[in-house]
Amino acid sequence: MRTADKWKDYRLVDCTCSEKLEVWKDISLIRPDPQIIWKTPKKSDLWDKAHAHYIRSSSGGGAWEYNRKIPESWQIKYDDLTFNIRPTGFKHTGLFPEQAVNWDLMRKIIENSCRPVNVLNLFAYTGGATLACAAAGASVCHVDASKGMVQWARDNAASSGLADRPVRWIVDDCEKFVRREIKRGRKYDAVIMDPPSYGRGPNQEVWKLEDCIYDLVSVCTEVL
């Protein structure tokens, strides 16, 4: 198993009882995580001093409880990439730091290819993979159903000094976009995707992983 152990601006401090304690630059956050099924004793005093704690609601969703004032957004760096972080109403911060191992792999493959590389990034979120590929010299088509997330990704690219790289920023339903790319005859050297288990497209199209993933993977083979 590869671990994301090169971070300097992010730390997973502790995790227990369906929650994790993290430090993003110098901001400490407690967030729920259903995969943390163990109930070991807490190992850090920071649990009681965290800047903010996301509290799940019994009726669904949740909200942030702030113990100390924090900025609306702040930046963290990974290697030469800069990301804008901010707590959202859905517990997320705009970045999945464990994905850094995949960014490193993508960059290595692209840099070693010794030729132009064209990448399609689906469900591209705030652009971690897009930035990694662009920084390595690839042309990238970044697709996400959320206009807000695509703008966030563009902001991350600008913060990373990559605003002038060849990236197409697309707000669209991923499968519909791929089908149109097939009709246009476009081809890519690689397709990246990290689909959610459930979501909605820009026109309220329903995405359920177990119902939709096979068709999506099948059509993606036609643009490779």
Model segments located where?
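Conserved alpha-helix/loop element of class I SAM-dependent methyltransferases that forms part
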Residues: 97-115
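Non-catalytic substrate-recognition/targeting regions of SAM-dependent transferases
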Residues: 6-22, 29-97, 104
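S-adenosyl-L-methionine
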Residues: 146-192
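Conserved SAM-binding motif I beta-strand of class I
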Residues: 139-144
